[in-house]
Amino acid sequence: MNFKSLSIMTIGAIALSATVSAKELRLSHQWSTKDVRHKFAQIVADHVASAKVDLNIKIFPSKSLFKPKEQYKPLTRGQLDMTVFPLSYAGGQQPAYNLTLMPGLVKNHDHAARMNYSPFMEEIQKIMATDDVMVVVHGYLAGGFAGKDKCITGPNDVKGLQTRAAGKAFETMLVGAGASIASMPSSAIYNAMQTGVLQAANTSSSSFVSYRIYEQVKCYTPAGKTALWFMYQPLLMNKSVFESLNKNQQEALMAGAKKAEAYYLAEAKKEDQASVNVFKKNGVEIKEMSADEFNAWRSIAKETSYKKFVSGYKDGQRLLDLALSVN
């Protein structure tokens, strides 16, 4: 074999080795590519790709890999590497996660950002670690109320109304305020209001717009200076998979995560304001929730949702107190 042939073989072997060593991570989520949750995941993927550390993140949007509520178990088993996931979906496996969709625990987006780096969230992450799961990007999204015939700002406003809530804890609180509950996905709110089945609804800011609820309601209470509905929807990763990456890959991933987290917070705030603009444009009255109304809701939540959570989970009171202690 001559020197030229040997050189070609050596170069080929090096190229093949580089190809083999490039690791691909699979990231799953339930939303379209236009959604903010896809966009922040894409920021992480793009940053990792540009770092040239032999690591690629392939995103599977729109429920194309797993059904939304079925992503947590595959993540814990290493069958899925990463997911943008509303953590309360896994509240059946880990009851503590239900605190990440609990009425009145988060007041606004800046409060949510403090919650992300609080002793409360540290405890939640310790529980995740027992399932071999870790957080890559923190983030909460907010929501509000809409009323077919009147504004829904305080507890008295829902008395006697057929209401849709986003999450079991919110349903429990609304029943405590005197509402009747009609359980349905947010995609069904429009028709339910149109046919008179529903008089009030609670969902995320983005869902209010994407499902055109502004065509069916008289008044909208958005997430403003105070809001009742916040849902923790982080980017999670299998912990063992992260630890299997080399130092450069880990650093690139977390640098991308830092950029994505800042974007996610800014866009979450923009979504709330964008929903206000759309409802206003369509002639819907806008009425924000006052601090006193927020406190009135929280008082009812303490006697309903919080009490139910604590009674069903032995470590519930300690974790609830930690969450309530975040200023």
Which role does the model predict for each range below?
Residues 1-8:
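Bacterial N-terminal signal peptides that target proteins for export
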Residues 12, 23-111, 120-327:
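N-terminal secretory/targeting leader peptides
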Residues 9-17:
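Bacterial N-terminal signal peptides
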Residues 1, 22-23:
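Absolute protein N-terminus
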